[in-house]
């Protein structure tokens, strides 16, 4: 059991050393902005459609009950 724990500690230490030399990941800011604009336009379209539906329901003639 102790050999297994020592092996895991060794593997973790080696992975930390090897990862420290890797270049930091770059965040694609332009892609995030593009997606944000698309989502914003979609939400705006949903809001406009909802408003148009509310206006239509307000103006359409109501059915009379007998």
From Swiss-Prot:
Annotated GO biological process: defense response to bacterium; innate immune response
GO cellular component terms given for this protein: extracellular region
Localization (cell): Secreted
Keyword Membrane: no
Signal peptide (residue range): 1-24
Main subcellular localisation: secreted
UniProt keyword Chloroplast, yes or no: no
UniProt keyword terms in alphabetical order: Antibiotic, Antimicrobial, Immunity, Innate immunity, Secreted, Signal
InterPro entries registered for this protein in UniProt: Moricin_fam, Moricin_sf
Tissue specificity field: Expressed in fat body and to a lesser extent in hemocyte and Malpighian tubules.
UniProt induction comment: By bacterial infection.
Similarity annotation: Belongs to the moricin family.
Functional description taken from the UniProt entry: Has antibacterial activity against Gram-positive and Gram-negative bacteria. Probably acts by disturbing membrane functions with its amphipathic structure.
Protein name: Moricin-2
Organism annotation: Bombyx mori (Silk moth)
Top-level taxonomy: Eukaryota, Metazoa, Ecdysozoa, Arthropoda, Hexapoda
Gene: MOR2
